[in-house]
Regions:
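A short, hydrophobic C-terminal helix/tail in secreted or cell-surface proteins
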Residues: 159-165
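A helix-coil-helix interface module used to build multimeric assemblies
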Residues: 1-158
């Protein structure tokens, strides 16, 4: 099993690791597409400041698109011994492109990656919820139109009193 980035030279007790890490790897699968999008933006910036060549950028973007497609289809997996989604993406890139794949983390901390992934994931979820609420709103409006002539007989468990002010 590969050594985790945070282990350094100390072996962590497996019970403590299970308690603190829990289902992180499982939950990271939800972040895979967002991690890839963040990496695409980051490497575009790296190329713009001269840390990647145009050719390296093209190769990385092509492979990141493949990884994104894999995540879209639900086929993206974090292999046993791989710490998290960020490490898995880098591993996939280095397997396919060699040392070019290692360059995606230049000038970016893991905390930056985690924060961006969570923000993108949250934004996507909020958008989906807003769309569902809008659909519900339209259903309720249609129902209210359909039943507008039926008088209300009870409100809050009490007989309804119609007022004509």
């Amino acid at each position: 099993m590969a050594q985790k980035l945070w282990e350094k030279s100390v072996q962590v007790n497996k019970d403590i690791e299970r308690f603190t890490v829990g289902r992180d790897r499982e939950m990271d699968l939800y972040l895979a597409k967002h991690d890839v999008i963040g990496s695409m933006a980051h490497i575009t910036m790296l190329e713009s400041i001269g840390l990647l060549t145009k050719e390296e950028l093209v190769q990385l973007l092509a492979e990141l698109r493949n990884i994104y497609a894999s995540a879209e289809k639900g086929e993206f997996v974090i292999e046993e011994g791989v710490e998290d989604v960020h490490s898995q993406v880098e591993l996939m890139l280095t397997r396919r492109l060699g040392d070019i794949g290692k360059k995606i983390h230049s000038g970016r901390s893991r905390n930056d990656q985690v924060l961006l992934d969570l923000k993108l994931f949250t934004r996507t979820q909020i958008k989906e919820i807003a769309e569902a609420v809008e659909q519900l709103f339209h259903v309720l409006v249609n129902q209210s139109e359909r039943y507008k002539d039926i008088p209300v007989s009870y409100t809050h468990l009490r007989a309804h009193e119609t007022r004509h002010d």
